[in-house]
Swiss-Prot record:
Its cofactor is Mg(2+). This is Enolase. It comes from Mycobacterium bovis (strain ATCC BAA-935 / AF2122/97). Its main location: cytoplasm. Its EC number is 4.2.1.11. The keyword Magnesium applies. It is found in: Cytoplasm; Secreted; Cell surface. The lineage of its organism: Bacteria, Bacillati, Actinomycetota, Actinomycetes, Mycobacteriales. It comes from the Bacteria.
Length: 429
């Protein structure tokens, strides 16, 4: 049996130069694995709590307390447990913390241990991680939702929408989808240069020009797709992450592109975009606690576009269950650090799929070289992954891992393509 023998932890840096937690787990059979924890810039209020140190060190963002929690409490609690019983290990972590939001020991400390244990168990079983988690039938390669133009909290510009993504839905394979996305990315750089706009990068590797607004950004990306010799819609669709909580104020409303709007007015705005651009997905179109607005928006345009819940669900099965009951969104964004353990993440995915919701695996803006989410996307058959632009090594690491997985699967590999958006892709053709 792959019994946990040692647990270690350290403070490392993420892609934004902020500290994060890295955990190492050794099993009694000699197997060793390591996991690093990501961190978000725009975070949902209901996410698992990151334990930060405060004070002057690293501007208060140090994670020595979380590291110490692993060394002093979490590690001793899981040593001796069977690593291939992930649910048992994760339940021990949840029980040890004892809070609903993992605020005592820190979601970052708990998640690091959870993921490192899963990796160690996979290695002990001599299985790739995607196969260990997903079983023998895992074979679907996800559509890369590439954030090639950054705004909102990911860029120092006046663009309110946080992410403008391209989705190569018409590609025959993941390797070709990645090529198409990279070529559009480079074409966009040329388009921006021609327009005299900045080609500086945002947090997730996308360009961060200060453009006039949403439609101006979508027009630039559409030009880039055509410049790359591809067809907007049929070959490469568009997607947005509005991260609307970032421009919502209680008592005021949505302060968006220079005007204050209601949820209904935001819905009208998105509906107008659907008529003008080949959009297949809109994430967080409204604020994280605007349940009634979300339900009305979903009823209005949910049959035309994928509506992804991130901040409103925070990968939490309880919040997702409420969303399903109330008709909120039709897809779940999956971020392992929002809920804090692999088991709870998989429970949320199962609930989403049983409820008829699609799932999109996601990185965070503060990333590391850890590639676990690439394996997770294939393991759960999500058909979609969001892990930034095809640039910056912490983003590209995930794409490169997916290339390896596709190669390892050989003839069994299937690229999700437009089947990842069965109700919506027809709108783009």
């Amino acid at each position: 049996m792959p019994i946990i023998e040692q647990v270690g932890a350290r403070e490392i840096l993420d892609s934004r130069g902020n500290p994060t937690v890295e955990v190492e787990v050794a099993l009694i059979d000699g197997t060793f694995a390591r996991a690093a924890v990501p961190s978000g810039a725009s975070t949902g209020e209901h996410e698992a709590v990151e334990l930060r140190d405060g004070g002057d060190r690293y501007g208060g963002k140090g994670v020595q307390k979380a590291v110490q929690a692993v060394l002093d409490e979490i590690g001793p609690a899981v040593i001796g447990l069977n690593a291939d019983d992930q649910r048992l290990v994760d339940q021990a972590l949840v029980d040890l913390d004892g809070t609903p939001d993992k605020s005592r020991l820190g979601g970052n400390a708990i998640l690091g241990v959870s993921l490192a244990v899963a990796k160690a168990a996979a290695d002990s079983a001599e299985l790739p991680l995607f196969r260990y988690v997903g079983g023998p039938n895992a074979h679907i390669l996800p559509v890369p939702m590439m954030n090639i133009l950054n705004g909102g909290a990911h860029a120092d510009t006046a663009v309110d929408i946080q992410e403008f993504m391209v989705a190569p839905i018409g590609a025959p394979s993941f390797v070709e989808a990645l090529r198409w996305g990279a070529e559009v990315y480079h074409a966009l750089k040329s388009v921006l240069k021609k327009e005299g706009l900045s080609t500086g990068l945002g947090d997730e590797g996308g360009f961060a020009p200060d453009v006039a607004g949403t439609t101006a950004a979508l027009d630039l990306i559409s030009r880039a797709i055509e410049s790359a010799g591809l067809r907007p819609g049929a070959d490469v669709a568009l997607a947005l992450d509005a991260a609307a909580t970032e421009f919502f104020t209680d008592g005021t409303g949505y302060v968006f592109e220079g005007t204050t709007r209601t949820a209904d007015q935001m819905t009208e705005f998105y509906a107008g975009l659907l008529g003008a651009y080949p959009l297949v997905s809109i994430e967080d179109p409204l604020s994280e606690d605007d349940w009634d607005g979300w339900a009305a928006l979903t009823a209005s345009i949910g049959d035309r576009v994928q509506i992804v819940g991130d901040d409103i669900f925070v990968t939490n099965p309880e919040r997702l269950e409420e969303g399903i009951e109330r008709g909120v969104a039709n897809a779940l964004l999956v971020k392992v650090n929002q809920i804090g353990t692999l088991t709870e993440t998989l429970d949320a995915v199962t609930l989403a799929h049983h409820g008829g919701y699609r799932t999109m695996i996601s990185h965070r803006s503060g990333e590391t070289e850890d590639t676990m989410i690439a394996d997770l996307a294939v393991a759960i058959g999500s058909g979609q992954i969001k892990t930034g632009a095809p640039a910056r090594s912490e983003r590209v690491a995930k794409y490169n891992q997916l290339l390896r997985i596709e190669e390892a699967l050989g003839d069994a590999a299937r690229y999700a393509g437009d089947l990842a958006f069965p109700r919506f892709a027809c709108e783009t053709k």
